[in-house]
Amino acid sequence: MLKTSLSLIIVAVLIAAGAADAAVTVTAAPALTAPAAADTAALRQKTLSLSAMVPGGGDHPIRLTGSEPSQYFDFALRRDEAVVNAVLNLTMTASPSLLAETSQVNVYLNGELQTTVQLTKALLGQRANVEVPLDVRRFRAQNQLMLQFVGHYQPVCENPANEVLWLSVAPESALKLTTEKLKVANDLSLFPAPFIDAAGDTTAPAVLPIVFAGTPSRETKEAAALFASLAGKLAGWRGIEIPVYYNALPPERHFVVFRTKDTDPDFLKDRPLPLGPAVTMADAPFSRTAKMLLISGTTGEDLNAAVLALADTKRVLIGETLAAAGTRPVKRAAWDAPKWLTETTPVTLADLAQYPGQLSAKSQSSARVTLPLNLAPDTWFTSPENLTLNLAYRYTRPVNHADAQLRVTVNDVLVDSENVSTAESRGTAKVTLPIASGALSPDASAAPAMKGRNALAMTLAYSRNFSEGSLTNCRSASLLPQQLEVEPGSTVTLSGAYHWAELPNLAMWLSGGFPYTKYADLSETALVAPKTISSGNLSVLLTSVARAAQATGLAGLNLTVVEDWTDNRLTDKDILAAGTLPEGALTDFSTRAAQELSTRLSKAVQAKTWEKTSASFTGNAAVTAAFESPFTSGRTVTMLLTESDEAAQMLSRRLADTSDLSSVSGTLAVITPDAVYSYAAAPTFTSGNLPWYRQVWTGVSGHPLLVSLAALLCALLAGTGVYRFMRRQVRGRS
């Protein structure tokens, strides 16, 4: 019955596809139709979760104590917006043992006290909602919010480390901002702002629409793919979604337009077209504040040249228009993505830092520095010595003969620790990072192991001993802030590792863009975008390219775009394709159906008849299917297939979120708005540079009985050889 119900539910989705109770609330003081979201008001509401602004915070509550009374929250504002109203919504629970009225929470914005919330009896021991208005005049481009807990449990002789001193801030606590859009100058020196602003809302992926006059030509699609890859690199870890519009204005926001002499959107018909490749920043129609980035050219080849010029980091951007032609960069070597550790040279921690000040930390008792540590998804370790950290650091010396300890963790798993000197204020350490021989582990809880994306943390923890004394012999304690400074020249060294993977593997593709990102410039990647591709499916393809660039930190400026499966350029390439699911692709939710779909797709590609077998449906599911390329052995084809435009929009949104789809595995996945179902539906192959003898050992290491039999066979052969040798020796003497 359960299986039948589940099948009915899933088939309905896949047809044609293949509370918080609050006890107290306290308030502390023309020819072209305009887009649907026209600029009737330039105000925007956004909510920033406090937990999301804490490194590693996630959905966990924030706990303030007597020994750790402060928590900092860093956030930024876009250059083209100003705050007109700001309210901090705190959902918190205070210890019932606190003294009412004298205990309090101080709220600071950029170092200036905003308000003090007194913890009255009504607020102790139960959840309470507190609204704190903030002074909008104190907001800057880079901002820091601080909560300071001042708790008391007795009038005199208190111990700051007493366990009754605590305040818990719930994960739903948030900073609610009302911002007004500002009009910025048409100046390319601002680029990538305002189109991609790294100082914007970092809690959600960026969104940058692209507009075409209609279904674009192959050359225009290639230019758009180059730009999407550049956008993914610029958006960084937050990710980016790239919606596509055909001859229509997107809802109120900044956007990009590709235009040529023969393909110009209706809303630009009266605007002169520059001669040759050009990039121009201009005001968007029907908007007081939105901008459009016009990528223009006489032909589609000019559009490619314009994007390449924009991506040239050596070129100075200034003024409204860049009239220049760029060229394709030299092909890069394998596995040399800027964001990945490589064996060519040690990587400094300064290179791993994502923002200024990341190598510095302050705290009352444990200063923590956290850095990303990324590896190529197919990295294969052979020894625990493959990955080492050479660390140099400075710190505040412990006082009164207290102890201090440096702890190094990877993914919150302890790697090493050592006591630091109380006589010095600097130290060094050589740490071997945790490695289990073999492939990277996709399991975040596996230890010791490394994943493709890791969090390297260095924490300096200080011991504190407090004595309350007595009413007649009161002893006071002063909590001095502690500071840890990691030297930028500290290095992480990768050596002696290989590259080896079983492909296709959707988990590798979604986490690191592999195998396409093996060459970070995508020089061995081909995109298949049919001549009649829908705007939704083109959006999926472009967002996928942007996601790959986000994983490598490099724009894939050597990619290739083709329009059909008969193109000879598909040979010796890893292929990424987007399209519509064929009719009847999934009629039953089962492993067998998934395997049949994977086989069907592979045969359709091999027969070069994919476009002839596609159809349009009205469901809301998508399928990602990967299999070995029928054109070149050892290469991968990944197909992104949707049932409808709604499904394409859903898949594009989920691909834009770099933390989403982490549960996908195998070779085929069915993706719905609420769930993901993975299958091992296609044969796999191996790829990499692992020596043959290690391949043999890898193949048999998972079969202990086979290893035992092989050992017995070797012993028997060796014994037989020795026996025969000795027999010959005896016969020779006689």
Question: What kind of region is each of these model predictions?
Answer:
Residues 15-20, 31:
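Intrinsic disorder/low-complexity segments
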Residues 1-5, 703:
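Positively charged n-region of N-terminal signal peptides that target proteins for export
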Residues 7-16:
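Bacterial N-terminal signal peptides
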Residues 24-734:
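Solvent-exposed alpha-helical segments and adjacent loops
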